[in-house]
Amino acid sequence: MATARTARSRRKVRKVRDKWKEKVWYEIYATPEFGGVFIGYTPANDPSLVLGRVAETSLRDLTGDPTKHMHRVYFKIFGVTGNKAIAQYYGHDTTREFMKSQIRRRRSRIDAILDVKTQDGHKIRTKAMVLTAYRANTKQKSDIRKKMEEIIKAMAKEKTFPQYVQAMLFGEMAEKIKNECKKIFPIKNVIIYKSEVLSLAKKEENEGFVKEAEEETAEAQE
């Protein structure tokens, strides 16, 4: 009886191993706004199974900038060519440890959470936080929040999807918010701490974006 079970167990192990042998390891690359950099690998026995998968990496690994270690970036695979998968920005967040380290007593935290549409029709939820140098009153906090929302909406309206992503992650948006809000009250820090792609542009526009991304990513890898 024990021998029979052992034989069945061996057959199961062989079957599992055979399934893995059938899988192909696809290389995941970011879209051109991130330089078409390599993100990682994902296994599948059919390229259609790769589409829609979400890969995670740190902004530090993407940019080579050690000061960006606190941000995690998510990419969703939307195209496969050969054994290469192209992944589009899908969102980002910030580590809880970093967020806690920035919040201090006797400071005010002002949050702005907006769903905006970029110039080319992509909808993104953006979450930003302003930390004041010391405690602000109710009106000052209200004025700061209004200014934050005004800046985020304006940037979305004037920028394409890749440009808006860069503004969020590489400091342009935070710097703009800080420079404008410090006219209202002294500001300690501004963090664009989270974002999420809610929907893409209509199909024909998105297909053009996919084709362009595939071509530019291929050029970046040459």
Curated annotation (Swiss-Prot):
What are the GO MF terms of this UniProt record? Answer: structural constituent of ribosome
Q: Which GO terms describe its biological process?
A: translation
List the InterPro entries hit by this protein, alphabetically.
Ribosomal_eS1, Ribosomal_eS1_arc, Ribosomal_eS1_CS
Asked whether the keyword Ribosomal protein is assigned, the reply is yes
**Any one Gene Ontology cellular component term annotated for this protein:** ribonucleoprotein complex
Ranges in coiled-coil conformation: none
**Keywords from the UniProt entry:** Ribonucleoprotein, Ribosomal protein
Asked if the keyword Ribosomal protein belongs to this entry, the reply reads yes
Q: Which Pfam families match?
A: Ribosomal_S3Ae (PF01015)
Recorded hits in NCBIfam families, A to Z, give:
PRK04057.1
Alphabetized HAMAP family for the sequence: Ribosomal_eS1
Q: Which family does it belong to?
A: Belongs to the eukaryotic ribosomal protein eS1 family.
Name of the protein in question: Small ribosomal subunit protein eS1
Native species: Methanocaldococcus jannaschii (strain ATCC 43067 / DSM 2661 / JAL-1 / JCM 10045 / NBRC 100440) (Methanococcus jannaschii)
